[in-house]
């Protein structure tokens, strides 16, 4: 009996050691269902573009920062819904502009800078909600390509410091 009790006691102790907390976490899931032929990839729906450190002297000489890609990835485009489209998808951008310049997105931080975005065809984006040209959409995944850069704001005075800007985009399928 003593051997059985000792064995049971040892088993209980050893199980207690194995049950120690070896890590845990929480997984949150979220998303949005939209009424559209395509979904928007998460990395496209909420983007941050970092321009790094830009030379004030270069911007003062009418230079621009290094151009960065700004892509909007459409995913799981449904063939049936795409077949109903006449033109494709148009993208419009909104944001705070500077000095009435609709193609210059204003920045915060009093640096005298503006953000410019160009569509793949080279046309500059307006931040007043005006939609650009329609892009045909195919079944599956599609990427709407833009480039963006920083420049001296029209009528602005450049100052050193950090800046930020926010633009929103909206898709309209036609």
PLM features per residue range, with description:
Residues 1-3, 17-174:
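Mature extracellular/passenger domains of Gram-negative fimbrial/pilin and adhesin proteins
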Residues 6-14:
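Bacterial N-terminal signal peptides
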